[in-house]
């Protein structure tokens, strides 16, 4: 089986259908994907089934699931896609896993998600600029790292503490801050300018 797709790019409109293992969208051009259509085809129609997908759209959130050949996302509204979920249906889902990863503004390529998992970001307002989608035989290894396939922005109050944390240095790889207005403790790992929240 092979997945083909079309992307609707900000400022460019619909691109020609192509094999999604290569790339849907663009990198290095700061152009967001606003909508996608996906299809799954099998050589000689040896499998039945199809593909379902769901887009997380700027200022909208998660749309409903749609399927083979239909549009996920929006056109004519200047709203970019921020995340995707993709899954196989029918017989093809018994023999293959679908892996996909997003190239997101300010983050670049994220890790691989599979079979309906979230891929992309939420809460940052960052656009998906490109995506790769691959089919692999069921229960075989991912095409690459699956770490950080989806990044959800921390709540504002945690984010404020993160910003404050990055003003401080520590003689250890850890930093502890106390938010006196909320009476919460934040624990960070890393170094000055690159503290990552591990507990709040």
Language model features: what each stretch is:
Residues 156-200:
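Cell wall/extracellular polymer interaction/catalysis modules
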Residues 1-156:
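Lectin-type carbohydrate-recognition ectodomains
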């Amino acid at each position: 089986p092979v997945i083909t797709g079309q992307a609707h790019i900000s400022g460019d409109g619909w691109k020609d259908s192509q094999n999604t293992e290569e790339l849907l969208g663009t990198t290095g051009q700061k152009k967001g994907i606003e909508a996608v259509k996906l299809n799954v085809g099998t050589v000689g129609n040896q499998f039945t089934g199809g593909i379902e997908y769901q887009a997380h759209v700027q200022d909208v959130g998660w749309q409903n699931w749609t399927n083979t050949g239909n549009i996920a996302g929006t056109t004519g509204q200047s709203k970019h896609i921020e995340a995707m979920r993709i899954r196989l249906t029918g017989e093809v889902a018994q023999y293959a896993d679908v892996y996909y990863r997003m190239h997101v503004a300010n983050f670049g390529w994220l890790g691989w998600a599979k079979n309906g998992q979230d891929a992309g970001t939420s809460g940052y307002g960052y656009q998906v600029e490109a995506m790769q989608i691959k089919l692999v035989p069921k229960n075989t290894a991912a095409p690459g790292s699956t770490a950080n396939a989806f990044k959800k922005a921390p709540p504002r109050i945690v984010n404020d503490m993160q910003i404050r944390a990055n003003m401080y240095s520590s003689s250890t790889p850890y930093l502890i801050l106390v938010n006196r207005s909320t009476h919460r403790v934040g624990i960070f790992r890393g170094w000055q300018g690159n503290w990552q929240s591990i507990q709040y």
